[in-house]
């Protein structure tokens, strides 16, 4: 399912990404968190900003505008009229509006008709768990759209545990149940599923969280092989915004480079995340001062400062093949 060409250390990529996500003037979420890493890794990125806010909504105040489905359609029509709507990848993240999400699906379907090898990477942002209890932070009417329209056209999805449970209607209490949920998600459409975080216990203790991945690869003879992995990721004692957007963008890049090796793609993605977050928390604590809690502004991802780690991450998190 992978498209284009990619060369480590030089050479232009032929791959072009249409990224439909939020935008902030200050900070790194949505397209701001995805565009720079993808460009550093050799991709052309065309960004549609689903919202334009002054900053992310974790601050005390924010101002801005929201793009509606008609405006999204108009932007896409402009690309189409000029015959510049050829893409290898589509990347989407947080969306609050049902009609906007349906328009995204229409665009993806049309692009896939033009290029059957196009890969759609979807982070189905709907909610999360706090202290074991899950809650949605988007309108509930988005769930059936994700289930019935979005996931079936996606090739790679990156839900957290709660979102995977929402999509399948099945709770996860064990690794075996998580693997079964990923199989259910495969059956809905995507060949690659990564559950980016879970509340499953880690053998390494409470300071680690478990992430799981599953990738189905089809051989020319029609046979299907499945690679499943588990990763134990050291927790960072801070609340960051934009990490899911960064994760999805880097997973797009590294699955492109390693199309049939989810283990390596996830190791590089998670290791790069580790370096970015470590640098961010160190800088935030230094700016806040000893014993003081860093502010949202101080916890903005140190993206530019992490360019080398994004480009060529030292692998510090190993994945286990299950």
Curated annotation (Swiss-Prot):
Instruction: Give the InterPro entries listed for this entry.
Output: PM/HMP-P_kinase-1, PyrdxlKinase, Ribokinase-like
Means of activity regulation: Activity is increased in the presence of K(+)or Na(+).
**Any idea of its EC number?**
2.7.1.35
Q: Might you name a Gene Ontology BP term for this protein?
A: pyridoxal 5'-phosphate salvage
For the ligand (pyridoxal), the binding residues are: 22, 57
Q: Which GO molecular function, any one, fits this protein according to its record?
A: metal ion binding
Q: Which residues carry this modification: N-acetylmethionine?
A: 1
From what superkingdom does this record's organism come?
Eukaryota
Q: What is this protein called?
A: Pyridoxal kinase
